[in-house]
């Protein structure tokens, strides 16, 4: 900025101390800096400072608070990432604790930009007070401020957390929403390392979460279960929940749901929680916590709409792994009954349940989604999945039933049906069934069917898989390979346009 502009800012700055009507002065400062180059404005602001502007937020007349925020925002935009916090640390501390939402939002945004860009921009020893102040803002009444505080506090350097976690406990004295925000930070950092998890345990957060499951607030309980399920995927997380007895206590809560008038609302959350653990540790969960399996199978058998979608997702998530499939089949008749029930749901349910049931079935049949598995498929799995697929329709032909569902014109149902067909075609027995059912190959190769982009891509992947099969004759294999070569979106119109362009 020119020396004239610098002097003008000094005059405006001085007037903020003496004039009662500060609105025209703030507008003048706003106009002065609005279009000035950042490099010039930064020098002026660094030399003169922003104390008098900030002081405008500390007067009895609050009518100019929004305008003051606008002026400060323009000033802050002239600085690089992290520089505002470095140059005006004490001011940022004041702004973070201000009663006005827009003021706190302005300050937390500056810290957010710094931490997200490079957490090392603000060394912990120098800025620990800033980090503590932000951590306590996870219980801010302004949702935007609270959400930014969660992200910032979840991404600090390790050495900040002993102090931050200690001071963030203030959130546990607030309402359930604030406590959940603090829990979210705790889970976010606990997933990063065992050391941070241990720090969270030592500060009592995890134990507090488990105890809070006794709350009568349904949404609060479900949020806690969701967060604990994220923690349980870590070996140290599940080990703690088991050794501390937390899993036993959570299991007991499932047993109490039948006596709880809100049990129907809570059961989906508990099923989802245990399914997230059983996905990784099916054998241990099935053996030690049979009440979970009973609740899962009962939910599927009952057909209760409030819990059925989650139960179908949960069973599919458990059964997507090879170990999950083997553990489920070891359960015996309760699982077989569940499979048969899912077959009925696929055939006779409204669209939403039909789709969930199809995806559940696809997960149970598929053997390629279990990434850790290597080598040939276990022969037991081949036999099991073939038998499970027959349960799609025991009174008729299961593959003909699937063909009929694939022909349903609704895009979401068609896509789910293709997902199941793809899972079936991962097996030799599945390829043989496709070859055996009259009209199935012709249906797959028929490009005249009006299908959305996702369905065309899904069908293309199935045909690509079948083009490598040994169960079809040479003529069909040639047609499959031609289809693959032409791509998922080829049509006679495409050929006609290409020929016209060639001519």
Predicted segments, located by residue:
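Short, hydrophobic/charged alpha-helical patches characteristic of ARM/HEAT alpha-solenoid repeats
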Residues: 3-4, 39-48, 79-87, 120-128, ...
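Eukaryotic tandem repeat interaction scaffolds
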Residues: 246, 252-413
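Solenoidal tandem-repeat scaffolds enriched in leucines and small polar residues
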Residues: 101, 111-294, 304, 311, ...
């Amino acid at each position: 900025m020119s020396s004239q502009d610098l002097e003008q800012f000094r005059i405006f700055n001085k007037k903020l101390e003496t004039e009662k009507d500060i609105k025209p002065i703030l507008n003048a400062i706003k106009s002065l800096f609005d279009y000035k180059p950042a490099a010039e404005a930064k020098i002026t602001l660094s030399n003169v400072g922003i104390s008098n502007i900030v002081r405008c937020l500390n007067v009895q007349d609050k009518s100019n608070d929004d305008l003051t925020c606008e002026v400060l925002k323009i000033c802050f935009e002239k600085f690089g990432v992290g520089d505002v916090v470095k140059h005006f640390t004490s001011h940022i501390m004041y702004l973070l604790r201000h009663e006005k939402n827009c003021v706190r939002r302005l300050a937390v945004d500056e810290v957010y930009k710094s931490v997200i860009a490079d957490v090392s921009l603000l060394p912990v020893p120098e800025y620990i007070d800033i980090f503590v102040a932000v951590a306590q803002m996870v219980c801010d009444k302004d949702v935007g401020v609270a959400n930014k505080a969660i992200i910032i506090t979840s991404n600090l350097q390790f050495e900040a957390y002993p102090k931050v976690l200690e001071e963030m406990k203030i959130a546990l004295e607030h309402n359930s929403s604030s406590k959940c925000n603090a829990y979210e930070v705790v889970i976010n950092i606990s997933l990063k390392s065992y050391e941070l998890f241990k720090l969270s345990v030592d500060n009592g957060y995890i134990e507090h979460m488990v105890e809070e499951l006794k709350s009568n607030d349904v949404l609060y309980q479900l949020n806690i279960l969701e967060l604990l399920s994220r923690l349980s995927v870590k070996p140290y997380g599940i080990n703690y929940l088991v050794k501390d007895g937390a899993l036993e206590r959570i299991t007991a809560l499932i047993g109490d749901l039948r006596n709880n008038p809100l049990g129907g609302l809570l059961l989906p959350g508990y099923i989802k929680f245990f399914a997230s653990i059983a996905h990784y540790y099916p054998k241990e969960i099935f053996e030690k916590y049979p009440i979970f399996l009973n609740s899962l199978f009962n939910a599927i058998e009952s057909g209760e709409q409030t819990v059925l979608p989650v139960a179908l997702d949960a069973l599919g998530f458990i059964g997507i792994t090879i170990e999950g499939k083997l553990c489920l089949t070891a359960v015996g008749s309760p699982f077989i009954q569940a499979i048969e029930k899912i077959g009925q749901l696929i055939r006779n349910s409204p669209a939403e349940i039909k789709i969930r049931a199809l995806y559940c079935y696809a997960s149970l049949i598929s053997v390629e989604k279990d990434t850790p598995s290597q080598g040939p498929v276990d022969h037991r799995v081949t036999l099991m999945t073939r038998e499970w697929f027959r349960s799609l329709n025991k009174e008729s032909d299961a593959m003909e039933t699937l063909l009929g569902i694939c022909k349903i014109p609704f895009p979401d149902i068609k896509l789910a049906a293709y997902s199941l067909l793809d899972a079936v075609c991962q097996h030799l027995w599945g390829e043989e069934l496709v070859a055996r059912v009259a009209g199935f190959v012709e249906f797959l190769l028929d490009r005249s069917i009006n299908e959305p982009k996702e369905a065309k891509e899904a069908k293309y992947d199935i045909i690509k898989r079948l083009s490598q099969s040994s169960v079809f004759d040479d003529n069909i294999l040639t047609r499959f390979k031609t289809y693959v070569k032409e791509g998922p979106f080829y049509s006679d119109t495409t050929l006609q346009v290409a020929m016209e362009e060639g001519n």
